[in-house]
Design a protein with these regions (language model features):
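Active-site loop/lid in soluble adenylation, ligation, and acyl-transfer enzymes
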Residues: 1-56, 60, 64, 72, ...
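Generic hydrophobic/packing signal
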Residues: 51, 73, 90-94
């Protein structure tokens, strides 16, 4: 597996990068699977592909604080990105025959991450709902996926040294909730991992045997996707 540690200053470029990496494997330009990690330097909101802005986001607070609202290609709920939110992206090949269902794809990734975090922290980690990792029924990792015919993108977050109090300012309670949430507030529902980002990077590389640097970074395609989709209101405000 190839490894890429790359964060862009422009939030939209970080979303476009995942799609561009997915295209590399889907089109056969890169044969190896890819692990990317990145950490944002600023706060911004990311909607799931089908999320309605008004239902999921406090638009007034975001406007008042100049928080950018973007939309990703994958499903799932809205998230607040920012310092202390550690992101990973896995681009896997052979999606059509290896992972026939969305649940199979998540289980392949999240069971490995569950074992990794249990070993790292000593805490009992549970796979909750279809795509969450939690400790004591409090979520620390949310994940989403996007499937193409030959490749699969699974990406997600780990809450590390993140200011959880900000989530309730910028995000509404989600319109769709897993049963284990039980309508709890963001502060009651979420927790942070007592792990340093450098340590998590190392463990992810070990878990996925991702030691060789990706030397084909599709910068031009990333720029094009920002111009055509991720950087525009037509995409981010479509719902």
């Amino acid at each position: 597996m190839k490894y890429l540690d790359l964060a862009f200053a422009n939030p939209a470029h970080n979303l476009a990068c995942d799609e561009a990496l997915l295209e590399l494997i889907e089109t056969g330009q890169v044969k190896d699977e890819i692990l990317r990690v990145w950490e944002p330097a600023q706060y911004f909101v990311v909607l799931g592909h089908a999320n309605a802005r008004r239902a999921e986001v406090n638009l007034f607070a975001c406007k008042e604080d100049r928080i950018t609202i973007l939309r990703r290609m994958s499903g799932g709920g809205a998230v607040l990105q920012g310092p202390g939110c550690f992101n990973y992206s896995l681009v896997l090949n052979g999606a059509a025959h290896r992972f026939r269902t969305v649940r199979e794809g998540f289980r392949h990734v999240l069971e490995r991450h569950r074992n990794m975090i249990q070993t790292l922290t000593g805490f009992e980690v549970a796979l909750e709902g279809i795509s969450d990792l939690a400790i004591g029924a409090r979520k620390f990792s949310g994940n989403a996926q996007y499937r193409k015919s030959r490749a699969l993108l699974i990406h997600g977050t780990f809450l590390l040294d993140f200011d959880l109090s900000l989530i309730g300012r910028y995000l509404q309670l989600p319109s769709k909730q897993p049963a284990y949430r039980q309508n709890r507030s963001h502060l009651e529902f979420l927790t942070k991992l007592p792990v340093r980002s450098a340590e998590l990077r190392e463990r992810l590389q070990e878990s996925w045997s991702a030691r060789t640097a990706l030397d084909k970074i599709p910068i031009d395609r990333i720029d094009m996707l920002v111009q055509q989709r991720y950087g525009g209101k037509e995409w981010s405000e479509k719902f």
